[in-house]
A protein has these predicted regions:
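Short beta-strand edge/turn micro-motifs at domain boundaries
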Residues: 106-110, 117-153
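Polyampholytic, low-complexity intrinsically disordered segments
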Residues: 62-65
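Sec-dependent N-terminal signal peptides
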Residues: 3-19
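Exposed acidic/polar residues on beta-strands and adjacent loops within beta-sheet cores, strongest
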Residues: 24, 97-101, 153
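Short, low-complexity N-terminal intrinsically disordered segments enriched in polar/charged residues
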Residues: 16-46
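A general lysine-centric signal
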Residues: 2-3, 130
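Short, well-ordered alpha-helical segments enriched in acidic and aromatic residues
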Residues: 40-58
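Surface-exposed, charged secondary-structure patches
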Residues: 67-119
């Protein structure tokens, strides 16, 4: 009886330990990502899976929101091109109120993104998936007030 109880208990506790370790690994990966992004590192593409989904939720000036999906190859080009300007103006994002939830085999990290001159912050989320022994961004979604995303091709 005691042995059966221990087996049942261990099958209940083990998944919780794995979940806790995954959350810690994802948070550590995200911290590195933010540090690299804020230092304009050229290795940012390494944090993403190939053809990751990139979404910008634009707060429209006339009211409402519009989701814009950016092709990953275009995102990489823009990332490379805009990093010099971001460096000149010392643009950085901070992420507060971070939460992680498990979604099937992936994890969703939700946070409030506080850009350089923003006072209130904007919603953001990243979906991480396991690739080999590391966690990669499968989807990135950020709310923005930048209107150019509405007309970008």
């Amino acid at each position: 009886m005691k042995k059966a109880f221990l087996i049942i208990l261990s099958t209940l506790i083990f998944p919780l330990c794995v979940f806790a370790n995954d959350k810690e690994d994802i948070m550590a990966t995200f911290d590195k990502y933010v540090k690299d992004a804020n230092s304009y590192s050229t290795n940012l593409p390494n944090y993403y899976i190939e053809n990751a989904k990139i979404v910008r939720i634009v707060n429209k000036k006339q009211g409402g929101k519009k989701a814009v999906v950016i092709p990953f190859d275009r995102y990489l080009k823009e990332l490379k091109g805009h990093s010099n300007l971001a460096k000149v103006v010392n643009y950085k994002n901070n992420y507060i109120d971070r939460k992680i939830e498990k979604i099937d085999n992936d994890y969703k990290l939700s946070a409030t993104r506080v850009p350089r001159n923003d006072k209130t912050g904007l919603p953001a989320h990243f979906i991480f998936t396991k690739v080999g022994n590391s966690w990669k961004i499968k989807e990135e979604s950020m709310t923005t007030n930048v209107q150019v995303f509405l007309t970008a091709k």
